[in-house]
Amino acid sequence: MRGKMKLSFIENDSVRKTTFTKRKKGMLKKFNELVTLCGVDACAVIRSPYNSIQEPWPSREGVEEVMSKFMEFSVLDRTKKMVDQETFLRQRIAKETERLQKLRDENRNSQIRDLMFGCLKGEVDVSHLHGRDLLDLNVFLNKYLNGVIRRVEILKENGESSSSVPPPIGVAPTVVDASVPIGFDGRMIQDQNQNQQEPVQFQYQALYDFYDQIPKKLHDFNMKMNIDPNQSMNLDLNDGEDEGIPCMDNNNYHPEIDCLATVTTAPTDVCAPNIINDL
């Protein structure tokens, strides 16, 4: 099998002449195929040291006709895609350099992405990173944060917000009728809208284990602040549980969930006397 010929000047005269004859014949054959298959105008003028007479293709008249059509175009159109060997090579080098830089950027982004997840998982110690890695990681994180912020803005523009997120699993809202008196700031709130067609619905979302988490969080805080747990504030959640609550003493409605709750009301005409009096 013949190997690929090296693209360089052939020093041997006889080999160079033989190569010229073969390549010239093959090139003229390609010209003929191009004109026949594609229906384009083409011509060639070959001048070589092996023949004192220039060789026009397909003929002298054919060359003059094609050149006359070519000269009818403006200078800008004629030179738009015209390049010499040096310009062609420079264009190829610039294109390959750009492609190489693009591949390097992609590889670097993959490395920084792996580095970011390694830091989040605790597999990489940030204090061991060098200056370039820290700078690239900073740029990468800012880029992702900007993407997240932009995504939030798009969701807000489309009418979607965090309030549309469904409640956590296992925390089912309790719905009660508005006719049941609700305690608010030590006083009673009654439905003042007599013409209301549908009852108002209140939703309670209980924060389970809220009180159970307070001692642990206080203990963790004391440990971080190096405070003696014996000297810390003693929190007793049962203090005052026997004291009477004015709004609940004569109320027949006692929720089974005795913990902090958030109240969500539908739009209605509900009047809070204590707020109106304060205003």
Curated annotation (Swiss-Prot):
Pfam families in UniProt: SRF-TF (PF00319)
RNA-binding keyword on record: no
Keywords: DNA-binding, Nucleus, Transcription, Transcription regulation
GO biological process, one term: embryo development ending in seed dormancy
Summary of the tissues where the protein is detected: Male gametophyte, embryo and endosperm.
Assigned GO CC terms: nucleus; pollen tube
Domain called MADS-box: residue spans: 1-60
Inducing factors: Repressed by MEA, FIS2 and FIE in seeds, and by PKL after germination.
InterPro entries linked: MADS-box/MEF2_TF, SRF-like_MADS-box, TF_MADSbox, TF_MADSbox_sf
GO function terms (MF aspect): cis-regulatory region sequence-specific DNA binding; DNA-binding transcription factor activity; DNA-binding transcription factor activity, RNA polymerase II-specific; protein dimerization activity
Compartments where found: Nucleus
Note: The PHE1 locus is imprinted in gametophytes. Maternal inherited gene is repressed in female gametophyte, while the paternal inherited gene is expressed in the male gametophyte (pollen tube) and in fertilized seeds. The maternal repression is dependent on MEA, FIS2 and FIE proteins, which may modulate the methylation of the maternal locus, and repress its transcription. This protein was called 'Pheres' in memory of one of the murdered sons of the mythological 'Medea', as PHERES1 is repressed by MEDEA.
Oligomer and partners: Interacts with AGL61/DIANA and AGL62.
Function according to Swiss-Prot or TrEMBL: Probable transcription factor involved in the development of gametophytes and seeds.
The protein's name: MADS-box transcription factor PHERES 1
Organism annotation: Arabidopsis thaliana (Mouse-ear cress)
Gene field: PHE1
